[in-house]
């Protein structure tokens, strides 16, 4: 099998006015995280170069906030063009919240190849997690990304207090969008957040990956946030469960494993690391 590696850059951090209960970037909670409006373009380009050197085929430009406005659109398109100029063969992913088709077309024109917008949780559970924007807005943005000609990456977060039935519901809703990639995140507790300070059981996490794979047999399944927390050194079990992609390096506001250590683990297992999104 081949494993796909992706890196992310939090190009705008901790300045979100929404109230998603799982997210330390919300200004409504007092999580101890870095907060800044924008990174410099130079910093973003250097991070992309490091990601490519660490065998990442994807590099995600993430902004904090509900969705795209004119300032965010201008900044992300600038960043995308700068990265593509210096690292032309890396696949760029935009993750910039809710968006209209015309905005997403602007991102595509600037060099964004894929758009990540997670459903986060099941429609029936969503109102218990977020009140400042609707689940329907999130779903529509996913449809908009496809209409704009972008590859869709959409998944969610497990372990927020949802029931088993709601997990099944969310997986069905994700599958209905026929995404290219499905990021699976596991909730990372933080004392500043109004959710239980509990972590999903590893066996449950593996079952989720298996169930998701049954629904999207041809999609990339990427285990992202919470991988190290939930699985520790046993994380390669996700590959047997059906995952074929991971995020390397740090996440938005939590630390990840060193990329070289993950690569070493994969090489010891004899796993081939993909060199293109389309292999």
From Swiss-Prot:
It is an enzyme of class 2 (transferase). CDD domains: Radical_SAM. InterPro entries: Aldolase_TIM, BATS_dom, Biotin_synth/BioAB, Biotin_synthase, Elp3/MiaA/NifB-like_rSAM, rSAM. [2Fe-2S] cluster binds at residues 60, 95, 153. The keyword Transferase applies. Binds 1 [4Fe-4S] cluster. The cluster is coordinated with 3 cysteines and an exchangeable S-adenosyl-L-methionine. Its cofactor is [4Fe-4S] cluster; [2Fe-2S] cluster. It holds the Pfam family Radical_SAM. Keywords: 2Fe-2S, 4Fe-4S, Biotin biosynthesis, Iron, Iron-sulfur, Metal-binding, S-adenosyl-L-methionine, Transferase. The keyword 4Fe-4S applies. It comes from the Bacteria. One of its GO terms (molecular function) is biotin synthase activity. It catalyses: (4R,5S)-dethiobiotin + (sulfur carrier)-SH + 2 reduced [2Fe-2S]-[ferredoxin] + 2 S-adenosyl-L-methionine = (sulfur carrier)-H + biotin + 2 5'-deoxyadenosine + 2 L-methionine + 2 oxidized [2Fe-2S]-[ferredoxin]. Residues 1-227 form the Radical SAM core domain. Pathway: Cofactor biosynthesis; biotin biosynthesis; biotin from 7,8-diaminononanoate: step 2/2. Its EC number is 2.8.1.6. One of its GO terms (biological process) is biotin biosynthetic process. [4Fe-4S] cluster binds at residues 16, 20, 23. Homodimer. PANTHER family: BIOTIN SYNTHASE, BIOTIN SYNTHASE, MITOCHONDRIAL. Belongs to the radical SAM superfamily. Biotin synthase family. Catalyzes the conversion of dethiobiotin (DTB) to biotin by the insertion of a sulfur atom into dethiobiotin via a radical-based mechanism. This is Biotin synthase. It comes from Nitratiruptor sp. (strain SB155-2).
């Amino acid at each position: 099998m081949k494993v796909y590696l992706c890196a992310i850059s939090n190009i705008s951090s901790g300045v979100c006015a929404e109230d998603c209960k799982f997210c330390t970037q919300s200004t409504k909670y007092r999580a101890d995280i870095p907060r800044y409006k924008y990174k410099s373009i130079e910093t973003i380009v250097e991070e992309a170069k490091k990601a490519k050197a660490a065998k990442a085929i994807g590099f995600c430009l993430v902004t904090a906030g509900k969705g795209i406005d004119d300032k965010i659109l201008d900044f992300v398109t600038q960043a995308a063009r700068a990265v593509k100029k210096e690292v032309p063969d890396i696949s760029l992913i935009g993750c910039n919240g809710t968006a209209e088709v015309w905005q997403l077309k602007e991102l595509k024109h600037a060099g964004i190849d894929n758009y990540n917008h997670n459903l986060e949780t099941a429609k029936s559970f969503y109102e218990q997690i977020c009140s400042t924007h609707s689940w329907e807005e999130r779903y529509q943005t996913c449809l908009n990304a496809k209409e704009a000609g972008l590859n869709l990456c959409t998944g969610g977060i497990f372990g927020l207090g949802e029931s088993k039935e709601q997990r099944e519901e969310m997986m069905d809703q994700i599958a209905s969008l026929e995404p290219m990639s499905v990021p699976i995140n596991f909730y990372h507790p933080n004392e500043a957040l109004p959710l239980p300070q509990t972590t999903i059981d590893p066996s449950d996490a593996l079952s989720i990956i298996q169930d998701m794979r049954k629904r999207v047999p041809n999609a990339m399944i990427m285990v992202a946030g919470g991988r190290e927390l939930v699985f520790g050194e046993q994380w390669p079990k996700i590959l047997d469960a059906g995952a074929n992609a991971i995020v390397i390096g740090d996440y938005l506001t939590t630390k990840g494993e060193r990329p070289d250590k993950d690569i070493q683990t994969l090489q010891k297992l004899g796993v081939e690391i993909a060199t293109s999104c389309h292999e």
